[in-house]
Amino acid sequence: MISFTQEIELFLKEYSIGHKFITVEGITFIQSLHNGVLICPIDKNWFEMDNPLHKGELMNRIRREHSDVTIIYIYEDQWHFHKTLTRGRLLSHLGLQKSIFARNCIIKEISQEQAAAFLQKNHIYGGTKAKYRYGLFRKRATGGQETLMEQTPTLVAVATFSSPKEIDGYMSYQWERYASLCGTRIVGGMGKLLNYFVEKQLSLGQSVEI
């Protein structure tokens, strides 16, 4: 039986992604030769190993020393139970997904049912009830590296926010969920949705903190 790290290696080979192994004090990373992303496989025995405090300190040190490099943590249970989502997320960080530019999208308020259905398919933790729900709809394409689209505006990303709580004179909101269409990277999507939400609350005369 192959290890979880070997499973990920086989997946990378399927997509012809060059990589190398890096081991730091017993923790094995796989580094993409394509864009330098560090992949940290977390198997089912990860939290049962000796000296978890040392491991946590080591991971913090690695993050500090490689602050210019993206580190992706892949959990074995999610890899097996959410195959499409976890693999799509990994490919996105490796720069191998289709791209859609947020500037070619419009934002609309969506229903709880729309948000829940989209998140159930495209977010590892599924949907959740939220006070505010917004969808990013693709309206046009500009060609180039952007993927082709149908004529009808398509829901490509969803963001949800909680009800506000007043803290020190500010209305504090929690960003509960964000997900893009599986297999697709929305360039600028998170920023566009967040800015829209903040500006809308400010227009209502509220001081906002997220």
Question: Where are the language model's segments positioned?
Answer:
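Short acidic loop-to-beta-strand element that houses the catalytic metal-binding Asp/Glu
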Residues: 24-42, 133-134
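A conserved beta-strand-loop-helix scaffold within acyl/acetyltransferase catalytic domains
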Residues: 85, 89, 94-207
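Short beta-strand-loop-alpha-helix junction that forms the active-site gateway
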Residues: 34-56, 164
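Short acidic, S/G/P-rich loop/turn micro-motifs used as interaction or catalytic elements
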Residues: 44-50, 78-80, 182-183
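Conserved beta-strand-loop-alpha-helix junction that forms the acyl-donor binding cleft
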Residues: 210
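Acidic-basic catalytic patches of nuclease active cores, encompassing PD-(D/E)XK
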Residues: 1-21
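Well-ordered, non-membrane alpha-helical segments in soluble/globular domains
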Residues: 5, 51-59, 190-196
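Catalytic cores of nucleic-acid endonucleases
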Residues: 51-82
